[in-house]
C-alpha cells in the first residue's frame, strides 16, 4: 500500500537497505520481494506534504526515463514508461500547487505505479547509482537526489559513446533516439535528434523549477571541500551500485566523477566548467 506517489515499490522486486551507519545504500533485487497485490489508493497521499510530493514525483519521472533507455527496455516497458512520464508532466505540477486536487493526486499515484511496472522489468540506470551514492553520504532524500542528477544523466546518455553497454537486446546505441521520441510524445518540438533531446532536458528543468526543487548539490548546503573530500568514496559507491548495469552507456570512473561535479554546480552546460581543475583529466 503506497503512501507516497513515487517509488513504485508496490509492484517491484527491489528494496534498499542502509549500511555503514547510514552512509551507503545497498540495493536488493529478488522477485520474492514483489508483492502479491497492490492497493493504489490516492486517499493515502491526500495529506502528503508538498516537499515530499515534489521529491517522490521526481523519483517517478526518473524511473520512467531510466526504464525508457535501459538496455532491458522493450515495447511493453516503453509504453508504461512513456505513459508515466506523460502523466507526471501533466499532473505533478498540479498536485504540488494544490495538494487537495484529487484528480492530480490520483493520476500521480497511478503514474508512480505505472513507472514502477516499467522499471521493475527494465530496471533503472546511472542516475540512480549516483543519487544513491551522494544521497546516502549526505542524507539527501532519494527523489531530490534523483532530480538533481536527471538533466545531467539525460545529456550524458544522449551523447553516443564509443563503447556502450553490451546486451543481447541491444544491437546499436539508441538512447538518444528514445529521448527524441519522448520529446515527440510530450509535444516539445524540434527537428534533429539533438534539438529534441535539448528540448526534453529543458522541459525537465522547467518541471523541476516549478516544484521548487534544488538544482545543484551545492544548494543543499554541502561545501565544495566536503564534496571533494567525499568524491573517492562517492565514485566507488556509484560504481559498485548495480543500478548502472542496465544503463545504455557504460560509465567510466572519471565520467561518474564528472557527472557528480556537474550536479554539484548544476544548471546546464555551464556545469561542465565547474569541475575543479585538479580533478579534470
What annotation goes with each model-predicted range?
Residues 6, 113-146, 240-245:
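Glycine-rich phosphate/pyrophosphate-binding beta-alpha loops
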Residues 226-281:
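Short, amphipathic C-terminal "tail helix"
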Residues 61-65, 108-116, 130, 150-154, ...:
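Short alpha-helical scaffolding segments that buttress acidic/His motifs in well-ordered protein cores
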Amino acid at each position: 500500500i503506497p503512501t507516497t506517489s513515487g517509488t513504485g515499490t508496490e509492484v517491484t522486486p527491489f528494496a534498499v537497505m542502509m549500511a555503514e551507519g547510514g552512509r551507503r545504500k545497498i540495493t536488493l533485487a529478488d522477485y520474492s520481494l514483489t508483492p502479491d497485490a497492490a492497493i493504489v489508493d490516492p486517499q493515502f497521499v491526500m495529506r502528503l506534504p508538498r516537499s515530499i510530493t515534489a521529491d517522490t514525483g521526481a523519483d517517478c519521472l526518473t524511473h520512467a526515463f531510466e526504464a525508457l533507455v535501459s538496455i532491458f527496455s522493450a515495447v511493453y516497458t516503453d509504453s508504461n514508461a512513456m505513459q508515466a512520464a506523460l502523466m507526471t508532466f501533466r499532473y505533478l505540477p498540479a498536485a504540488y500547487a494544490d495538494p487537495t486536487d484529487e484528480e492530480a493526486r490520483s493520476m500521480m499515484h497511478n503514474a508512480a505505479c505505472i513507472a514502477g511496472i516499467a522499471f521493475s522489468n527494465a530496471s533503472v540506470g546511472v542516475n540512480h547509482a549516483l543519487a544513491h551514492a551522494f544521497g546516502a553520504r549526505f542524507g539527501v532524500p532519494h527523489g531530490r537526489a534523483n532530480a538533481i542528477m536527471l538533466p545531467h544523466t539525460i545529456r550524458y546518455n544522449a551523447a553516443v559513446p564509443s563503447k556502450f553497454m553490451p546486451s543481447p537486446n541491444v544491437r546499436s546505441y539508441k538512447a538518444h533516439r528514445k529521448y527524441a521520441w519522448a520529446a515527440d510524445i510530450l509535444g516539445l518540438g524540434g527537428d534533429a535528434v539533438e534539438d529534441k533531446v535539448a528540448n526534453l532536458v529543458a522541459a525537465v528543468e522547467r518541471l523541476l523549477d516549478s516544484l521548487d526543487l534544488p538544482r545543484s548539490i551545492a544548494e543543499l548546503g554541502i561545501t565544495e571541500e566536503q564534496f571533494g573530500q567525499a568524491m573517492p568514496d562517492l565514485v566507488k559507491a556509484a560504481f559498485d551500485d548495480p543500478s548502472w548495469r542496465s544503463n545504455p552507456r557504460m560509465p567510466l570512473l572519471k565520467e561518474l566523477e564528472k557527472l557528480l561535479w556537474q550536479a554539484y554546480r548544476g544548471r546546464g552546460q555551464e556545469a561542465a566548467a565547474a569541475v575543479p581543475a585538479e580533478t579534470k583529466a
